[in-house]
């Protein structure tokens, strides 16, 4: 009888372990959950809060490019996430009726409570968390750069640019209200620019379309690591056959949106992934953006040229003590706009390109969207006048409020002469007048040539979306 009782206890322990999932998921109280979700990472989880004034230097000019704050899913993403309601029921049925699957019990309970609650009218608009991110960013910027931002507030002293897209405009308004007060619309009106969410004029460019259609990200989805991930997730959820890749990505979208929208939450769908799987999905997203908006396509750097040229023009004017220029410029745009601007400024460039086959070798990659392009991501250039050292004029760059240290600078503090020389090609009259697309492979034999100089107005509009 005693032996039978022992066997029953062992059986119960085994069943309990099966339901708890062992190492197949992290517990909600995990002291170190993996929360880096590529370009949909919550800003509050990654920004650098340790700002130190530059000794013997005073800021005289600030320029910032700011991505819109945390937003709700767009229409297509919302449709995909809503389909998880039926899928959720299948997962629960697998565990409770068919006794298949290996999810943690608390994750299964959390999954039962999960609901997708986003009003269709709010889709792709800034969220309350996004508004708070903008307010906090404005306060910190105002505190750090008080010497620049305490000047008389008017449209000549400060410039704010944003597209008319809701989430971008609302981000700019939240930031400006905190920075300049409730009357900012009269004192420092936001200059609206044409909304444009695509590379108009570049969609027929083979160099760009080939990078998208033949993306390394598509090949990565066929890699052994990726296929094994899909297989393991399917088994964990109790399916005898692999679930579709679209379901995996809907789960991932729900996970990262929920975390970004409610920072203190433990999203139900996040618990369905292991730490290693979240890292693999992060790499997939980074790889996708590397070829869409990154160094994987040569044309992307050219698209960012107009904004980089504008920035260098401002810095040059400050160096020449030109009084006919603003004290600060704030630009609000899209993820793609921020990234193509960073490309033009050689930020987050890896010595070895990201590919579908070097995932493990790219663990410490610079092109990590969670650190470069999270929600509310930003890049700033601050011009300093210094009393000591061999040069009065210095420039420091900040990526998500952390010092960005260009090689050749002193812990991030760069001499203006160094920056001027590094980006001299943006200071000439034809800084963006370069051929960026030539097609000699079409059957028609017609060459397609796109010149950035002809697309500068379009590129500027695109970069501000």
What are these regions (language model features)?
Residues 3-11, 450-454:
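Sec-dependent signal peptide recognition
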Residues 12-20, 459-462:
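Hydrophobic h-region of N-terminal signal peptides that target proteins for export
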Residues 443-465:
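Cleavable C-terminal sorting propeptides in eukaryotic secreted/cell-surface proteins
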Residues 6-7, 17-21, 442-445, 449:
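Compositionally biased regions
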Residues 1-4, 464-465:
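Positively charged n-region of N-terminal signal peptides that target proteins for export
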Residues 20-159, 163-442:
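Signature for phosphate-centric chemistry
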